[in-house]
Amino acid sequence: MKKRICGLLLGILCTVAFTGCGLEEKTELENTGPQKVELVVWGAEEDTELMNQIIEGFQTNYQGEADFHISFEVQGESQCKDVLLGGLEDGADVFTFADDQLSALAAAGAVEPIGNADEIERKNLSSTVEAATINNQLYAYPLTADNGYFLYYNKQYITEEQVKTLDGILEAAAANGKLFTMDWSSAWYVYSFFGNTGLQVGLNDDGITNYCTWNQADGEIRGVDVAQAMLRIAGNPGFASCTDEEFLSGVKDGSVIAGVSGVWNSVAVREAWGKNAGAAKLPTYSCNDRQIQMASFSGCKLIGVNAYSEHPEWGARLAEWITNEENQRLRFEMRGQGPSNIAVADSEEIKQSEAIAALLEQSEYSQLQRVGGKFWDPVSKFAGNMAAGNPSGQNLQEQLDEMAEGISAR
């Protein structure tokens, strides 16, 4: 009898204990709620309004699935790699960058292959997919197909005939007391003068160092010929070497009537010049008694997901959201940037864009930007001397040799 009573009491106690545990577990689950997801997004300052709108749409779309805390921070796309690799764990979860930085980011383990690569590849232009791919694996999400440059010009001052040659553009600028501008402090733009001359620069098989023949002293076009052509341009009263920001300021205040830039400035140029806003491929320039078509670097912008993010799955969802068809269309409407998404690229709105049309025309004379890190500073130094009129009087061949040596340094 005592055994039966003890057994009964033990059963009651166990039931109460298990019931209490169940209630406690249920309460904990109810109090947990959606997971808190904090994400930081990096992008260009000009993208602030656009990206905040895109982020807001993302949070609305996934409302209830997580407790989102997503913020946008300004970080220049051209310096993204260096800043991110300076502290991966402290860097943005999602970031915008130029495609030439992908190899270094992947090598450092900052980005990893994308899971749904087939779907992303199917929706985007092949050239942008190629730019986002390493060893047949997609590492980033294509965002734009317009990371190149062309000519903006004011039709009020420059005719369709003059816009074909740099001589014609400079003549029109000087005659009207205005300026044609180009950023010679940037090696990205300076490539224009060398790219279609037969002089070579590029990446060696090691993927790090460069080869360079820009100092070549023989052939139809020598390095000295290009240097002399640049000095003649620099000495023209209708020319000024200006940064992209200075170009835009000049467009707005009326001092600049032509300049080399990209689609990121198309909206601002159109607002400033109105119906007189024109866009065309880069002109030819005079070099060694002939006209040389100015070349350009081309590429695209990509969205990456930090491999060290605390929420990589949500980071990937956000990256895909930023680059989807709807938001690439919005990007074109708000920023005038050319889409990588095939459906948007084929739309009538894109076909009617004079800036995009100019970029496509220039693409025939463009080259994917594939150079190592030691390309930039030597070219900027050389071009800076040319822009200033070679004030030291140093021999041009010596300067070209120094530049080529710096570019190809190991």
What residue spans do the PLM features occupy?
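A structural signal for short loop-to-beta-strand junctions that line the ligand-binding cleft
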Residues: 85-86, 90-93, 121-153, 178-182, ...
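Short, well-ordered beta-strand elements
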Residues: 33-46, 66-73, 94, 139, ...
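Extracytoplasmic/periplasmic substrate-recognition and gating elements
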Residues: 271-334
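Extracytoplasmic/periplasmic solute-binding protein
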Residues: 139-143, 149, 170-215, 256
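Extracytoplasmic "Venus flytrap"/periplasmic binding protein-like
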Residues: 63-125, 156, 250, 257-258
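Conserved C-terminal helix/tail region of periplasmic/extracytoplasmic solute-binding proteins
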Residues: 358-410
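Hinge/lid segment of periplasmic solute-binding proteins
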Residues: 99-149, 161, 167, 279-282
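Glycine-centered hinge/linker elements that transmit conformational signals in sensory
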Residues: 209-243
